Amino acid sequence: MAATAARRFLTSFADMMHATPSAWHLLTIALISAVGGAINAIAGGGTLLTFPTLLGLGVPAVAANATSTVALWPGSFASLMGYRRELDGIERWAAHLAVPSLLGGLGGAGLLLVTPEERFRAIVPWLVLGATMLFALQGPVMRWLRGRTHADPEHAAPRALSPSLGMLVSQFCVGVYGGYFGAGAGIVMLGVFRLMGLTNIHQMNGLKNINGLCFNGIAAASFAIMGLVNWPIALVMAIGSSAGGHTMARVAQRVPQAWVRHAVTAIGLASATWLAVSR
């Protein structure tokens, strides 16, 4: 098994070096990633723009998914830092949920690694469609959550309590999805946390960010070790999405979030349709 993994790594790395994208492709990816970063900053859903773009530029589906995961992972730190204070008092929750997140992310990454390219490409339209539906439902779900959550310390998670076995299993399942594809995992986590009994929306966002960092991080490491990452594209995407999140978001914030959500939903539906008819 180790020899097979080593051969796959060397073969994939060599193929990736021969498949270095052109300057025009890199420029396109940088621009799309910047827009995706801005969308993530104000509404989420940037993956629904960047992932189909990589496919449209000829990047294999599995490599596109792996590259996106690696490229977008550093941005998770910024989100986590913004909510780090909200984890005060729920360190036990964070520590316990991190374990199934890591295991789930590893399982999801492993599942992707053993999925043949043809089969993954066949289910990609459904993954994009499902993620688009999750994104479209984000507004109603967040309104439902806000109606049942609070932002004050009185409604913080009890310090003495820990997640139940059912909660850990639920987070493991979210981690598997996050490691395998991941788009829309954030809104799924918020819903799961609410069902777990958490009522402080800021704490829920903090837990969402740290757990996303866990399952995306271990998945990214797995993809990198197995040689599935197109590093020139990953670097350009990381720079572009970071720039978009910090600069373009200032401009995009002048646009109502509802407009951005409708646009991303339309892009997701169009991408799913295109992926279905073009494969």
Set out the residue ranges of the language-model regions.
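Selective hydrophobic functional segments
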Residues: 67-126, 216-263
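Selected transmembrane alpha-helices and immediately adjacent juxtamembrane segments
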Residues: 9-62, 146-205, 235
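Transmembrane helix-loop junction
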Residues: 56-57, 113, 122, 194-195, ...
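Small-residue-rich segments of transmembrane alpha-helices in multi-pass membrane proteins
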Residues: 56, 61, 100-106, 131, ...
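Residues within membrane-spanning alpha-helices of integral membrane proteins
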Residues: 26, 69, 124-128, 132, ...
